[in-house]
Regions:
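Long, C-terminal-biased catalytic regions of enzyme "large/alpha" subunits
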Residues: 1-169
Length: 169
C-alpha cells in the first residue's frame, strides 16, 4: 500500500466520468446513429474536459501543482485539443468554443493539481444507484434486469413514458 499511497499523493489522479448520457441525448432529441448528437456531444465533452482542467489549474494556482506534474504532457503545453484524432473532424465539424490557449498558458504557469481528471467507464454501479443509463452507452432496452450480489434489480430508463421513442436501443 505504500506505493499506491505514494502514487496517489504525487499524481492526485481523479477518474471523473459520465452517467446518464443516453438520457441526455434522448431529452435533447438527438441520436447516436444518425449524427444528430455529434455537435451536442462535442460541446458537452469539450466543456467537461475544459472546466475540469480549469478547476485543477485554479487549485494548482492556490495550493501548488501535483508533485509529478512535470511528468505529464500538460507540463509540455500539450492539450487534448492537440492530440485528438483529426479524422474526427470528418464526422463532426463543430469548432472549439472555449479558450484553450488561455488555459494552456495558465497551466504552463501554475501547473495542475491533478495529473489525470477523466475516465469514461461504463459506471454500472453508479448508474444503478442513480437509476441512470450506463456511462456514455445506449441502453440495452427501456427496461433491463440486472443481477448483483444483492439480488435482481429491474431498471427503467429515465422518463421512459415521455421519451420512449427518443431512446436509441
Amino acid at each position: 500500500m505504500p506505493a499506491a499511497k505514494h502514487a496517489s499523493l504525487n499524481r492526485r489522479t481523479l477518474g471523473i466520468g459520465v452517467i446518464n448520457y443516453a438520457y441526455y441525448l434522448a431529452k435533447n432529441g438527438v441520436r447516436y446513429s444518425d449524427g444528430s448528437a455529434n455537435g451536442l456531444t462535442h460541446r458537452t465533452f469539450e466543456a467537461l474536459q475544459f472546466y475540469l482542467m480549469k478547476a485543477s489549474a485554479n487549485l494548482a494556482q492556490e495550493q501548488g501543482a501535483c508533485p509529478y506534474f512535470h511528468e505529464t504532457t500538460y507540463s509540455q503545453g500539450i492539450m487534448p485539443t492537440d492530440t485528438y484524432k483529426k479524422e474526427l473532424d470528418a464526422v463532426c465539424d463543430e469548432p472549439l468554443h472555449l479558450d484553450w490557449d488561455g488555459l494552456r498558458e495558465q497551466i504552463r504557469e501554475h501547473g495542475m493539481r491533478n495529473s489525470t481528471l477523466t475516465a469514461l467507464m461504463p459506471s454500472e454501479t453508479s448508474s444503478q444507484i442513480s437509476n441512470a443509463t450506463n456511462g456514455i452507452e445506449p441502453p440495452r432496452g427501456l427496461i433491463s434486469i440486472k443481477a448483483s450480489k444483492d439480488g435482481i434489480l429491474k431498471q427503467v430508463v429515465p422518463e421512459m413514458d415521455r421519451l420512449r421513442n427518443q431512446y436509441e436501443l
